[in-house]
Amino acid sequence: MNQNKLLIDIGSTYFKLSANGCVEQHFRDFNKDIYDDLKSKCEETISKYQKEDVYICSSANGGLSTLIIGLSKSFSLKYATNIAYNSGINIIDTVLYSHIKESSIPGDLIDVVIVVGAIDGVKGVFGQELLDYLEKINYSNIVYVGNQDDAHFIQQHIDNVVVLPNIIDHKLHIREEELKEYLTNLYQADIVGKEDIKHLYDITSNQIYPTPYIVNKTLSLLDGKFKVVDPYILIDIGGATTDIHYSKDLIMDNILNENEYDRLVFKKLGVFKSKESLIFSAKNNEFVYELLAYLKVTENIFQEQSEKALKVLMQLAIFLVLCKVSSYNKSYITLKLNALNSLIFTGGITKVLNQEDIQNIVSFFYKKILNSSHNPSIVMDSNYDIWTMAIRN
């Protein structure tokens, strides 16, 4: 790609521009449309570029949420959960169909419901119980990826359902491509479909992509820019979400096969828009008060609006996300963190924490949670080089 390009990232809290090797960052004004805010602060820079030379990515939607309904924990729920996580979708809950009558009803709007179960050739798996449950929940999209013999019943009784091939083949192997593509496209459509984002096509003629998607596509190139050693994890902590990208050889139970690297998006682990949910998650972690004492602060820090409070929130986000992908927490994909060689940090966190701040938290996590003296190297992407490299490529 020609170097004379303007690169723009629209985040949930900040937007940043990269031109001629220089990066500028601006805190968003939430009283303004994104386009108007961007133009008011960066008009001089933007006006120098033709629309075909402007490239934009965005993570401003904070990710999508899903509820998964499946027949078994060993196959349908397990397979669909892995595909959803690796498509950057946040899983609100999973429902075992045999317990659907007793299952709780989510209060929030679900972006997409996934229904899955049984191999092709098995019929009559889903019935009225499914329809009754769906009547009680509020969702925007629904996709069926179960046995094809029940597809007619599903289409006949559920409005606007999308039917895709079964994610479980006749040998009980996973078939991930169609569902992963559907979820990825849904995630992208949610971003570019927002009025704020659509307006940005006034300044670019190029496709607007989700930021986590393009960053993930660049991970194999990182060793040419940074001193990293596989296997590694890239953590991007922002205002609304925390994204984690990882080498697939770190996965304890790797059932997906398409990409060398995959990602998780934690929708409620941000330090600005998701601050309250981050604090809630922290207070529900049994080690958080010990961690606060280790950082020489009390829980009163949660009420503060200060630079110190922001640093502590960033450190908590690191600790919580490592907990979520470790053997301590079985709700997410478990990564072999004792095999980790490098931990890369990018995003706003590099403007708030220094290497020592991060190393202290990582060391605490390994000693307290994993009972290990393992010490992966910490790599800081302080100038957003990963994002710049991603969108250029």
Question: Where are the language model's segments positioned?
Answer:
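Nucleotide/phosphate-binding catalytic cleft detector across ATP-hydrolyzing
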Residues: 1-7, 22, 29-32, 40-231, ...
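Extended, charge-rich intrinsically disordered regulatory tails
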Residues: 286-295, 316-321, 369-373, 380, ...
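Glycine-rich phosphate-binding loop of actin/hexokinase-like ATP-binding domains
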Residues: 227-289, 354-378
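Short glycine-rich, Thr/Ser-proximal phosphate-binding strand/loop in the N-terminal lobe
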Residues: 11-37, 78, 86-93, 255-277
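Short mixed-charge
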Residues: 250-254, 327-334
